[in-house]
Amino acid sequence: MKASELRAKSVDELKTELLSLLKAQFGLRMQLATQQLAKTSELKKVRRDIARVRTILSEKAA
């Protein structure tokens, strides 16, 4: 997800997005632990998306 798309969302939408990304990250970590994850790059993508959302949230809070 692009930062420009995230900046257009409200704070509540961003918090919802963050929660869903954290759940996705947890699921991917469990798949990795049980050797079921084929695309390990998905973990990196989700981690970066989480960082983007948290950055935008802190920008909006300031």
Curated annotation (Swiss-Prot):
CDD domains: Ribosomal_L29_HIP. InterPro entries: Ribosomal_protein_uL29 (IPR050063), Ribosomal_uL29 (IPR001854), Ribosomal_uL29_CS (IPR018254), Ribosomal_uL29_sf (IPR036049). One of its GO terms (biological process) is translation. It holds the Pfam family Ribosomal_L29. One of its GO terms (cellular component) is cytosolic large ribosomal subunit. The keyword Ribonucleoprotein applies. Coiled coil: none annotated. The keyword Ribonucleoprotein applies. Keywords: Ribonucleoprotein, Ribosomal protein. One of its GO terms (molecular function) is structural constituent of ribosome. PANTHER family: 60S RIBOSOMAL PROTEIN L35/50S RIBOSOMAL PROTEIN L29, LARGE RIBOSOMAL SUBUNIT PROTEIN UL29C. Belongs to the universal ribosomal protein uL29 family. HAMAP family: Ribosomal_uL29 (MF_00374). This is Large ribosomal subunit protein uL29.
